Amino acid sequence: MFDITAARFNSEPAARKHLEKVRWPDGPFCPHCGCLDRAHRIKGKSARPGLWFCGECRKQFTVTVGTLFERSKVPLHKWLLATHLICASKKGMSAHQLHRMLGVTYKTAWFMAHRIREGMREINPGPLGGEGKTVEADETYIGGKEKNKHFVKRKKRNIGGQGKEIVFALVERSGRVRSHHVPEVSANTLRPILVAQVDRKSFLMSDDAGQYRVMGPEFARHETVNHGIGEYVRGHAHTNTIEGYFSILKRGITGVYHHVSQKHL
């Protein structure tokens, strides 16, 4: 249970002690040379709190070296609180909200939020799904209604999705999700993403749109549901997982961020 009054979110010594416990469960190691057993805490009135010395490479370090908190002038306890708030907020946390809760400038909160999100990014992620696993594919449209826009920005044609941004997503049931901002929903656009991000041994689930029917045979099995006739679930076949993801995404944009530009979508 989250307690905003916890010491690690309000005190530098407690925050440093918490991070050392989490990062060094078996004792401190040198982030410069990797030595595991020759680190010594530097003590004394003039010593910077949390400073360590490596007897192997003779370099100094703190627990923040090699982390997203390194070389930051923002207190560590505020970094820990910001990290927790972003990770615990199901619909996301805006920089304006962080700015108000942490007591830092908006510019600082914006920087912190981006650095934390970058630290959460997967490094060399493998494909979604795999043998016996199911991946759902679908697209959604993000953006305001044409009638609510200034007349200068309105599109001349009033058709579904006109003037909106397209987000194509892949969701691994009970697993990971990946989203892509795409210019259109044709098979030529979606196929390179699908075959690069999803293991060919996966079961693919989608709606009955033509672009998915073309790509379906490339996977172990492809099942569809026809929303046009009111079909949403047929045994194991459904896209409810990805629809739920899109619902959270849109509520987050509307309720937390209010507006997201094309660049940051």
Predicted segments, located by residue:
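Residue-level recognition of single "structural anchor" positions
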Residues: M1-L265
